[in-house]
Amino acid sequence: MIKVMHIFSRMNRGGAELRTMDTMKLLNREFEFHVCATSGKRGELDDELESMGITIHYLDIKKFSFPFKFIKLLKKKNIDVVHSHILFMSGLIQLLSFSANVRNRITHFRTSKDSKEQYNKIRKARNKVLKAIIEIFSTKILYVSNIANRNLISMKLFPKKHKTIYNGFEISNINKNFKKEENSFIYVGRFIHTKNQLFLLDVIEILKKEFNTNIEITFVGNIQTDYGKKFLSIANERGLNKNIKVIGEVNNPLDYLKTSEYFLFPSELEGLPGALIEAHHHNCIVISSNIKENSEVNQYFKDSSFELELIPKTWASTIKKLISRKKHISFNDSNVFDINMTTQELKEIYMSKTL
């Protein structure tokens, strides 16, 4: 049986981690999976992974001993495939994997850019070196979206190594006969700066003051962050507590998407936005920011997508028009993000002897 080791910083409930766990569930009988957490820390998904029979190894990539321990681990477990998801630090992972004679070395980019390098010249220089190492020592380089494919390594030394594979979702069993609550609004995602939930407070405020319209937005996702605390504080200061309903982190946000009519998504940065895809699959009317990553998804669901610049009044005006039923909405079906397609592509890559 082929042995595959996934590399993550920590197996918390993020999009890349959840989508990877979904593929492992489907392929668990055909491959032996391991996970290496390079933060050296346990994650929120560890218990579930261990219940699936997946071994998790904890090694701190910041420690001097990491390279030696990682190579030793790969050799001891006879790993055939290393599948790394830790952005440009995958360069170090693949160099070490090459040294350990791992046959298939996959680097998988799950975002479209490193937002931290913009103001850090040292990090930018470091990333340039790591990009070259990734190209040389990876046997396959995967991207979560075409935008990521174009942005992250624009000058490709080995074009045949590079491939876009969309995240997969279970869509064949979705029952579309759910009842939507009229004029119900939802946001799904953890509270961090790039998700831009504070923007929605501005939208709520303009709707109230300029359009005489009250809406309530349900927020599903981890709010136990510094940004989440800031969000709650500002909502309280502005007297908007009655306009927000905070659910927090849940195991299955789909139950909330099924009954919600509108999905709001003002992100400033995404890889391939999983929550956005799930919202489309559950026939939500989507109002999203017009970043390229969102556009790549929305192109498959044009009739129910409204892409807007991040201007609060524009969003407020659009919401007012939609709830006044001045626009007729129809929904498109698309299997582009079917998990069975994703799983088949990964299976072929894992089994390939010459990439």
Swiss-Prot record:
E.C. number: 2.4.-.-
Pfam families: Glyco_transf_4, Glycos_transf_1
Pathway(s) per entry: Capsule biogenesis; capsule polysaccharide biosynthesis
GO molecular function, one term: glycosyltransferase activity
Gene3D superfamilies: Glycogen Phosphorylase B (3.40.50.2000)
Keyword Glycosyltransferase appears in the UniProt entry: yes
Cross-referenced InterPro entries: Glyco_trans_1, Glyco_trans_4-like_N
Assigned keywords, A-Z: Capsule biogenesis/degradation, Exopolysaccharide synthesis, Glycosyltransferase, Transferase
Family: Belongs to the glycosyltransferase group 1 family. Glycosyltransferase 4 subfamily.
Name of the protein in its database record: Capsular polysaccharide biosynthesis glycosyltransferase CapH
Gene: capH
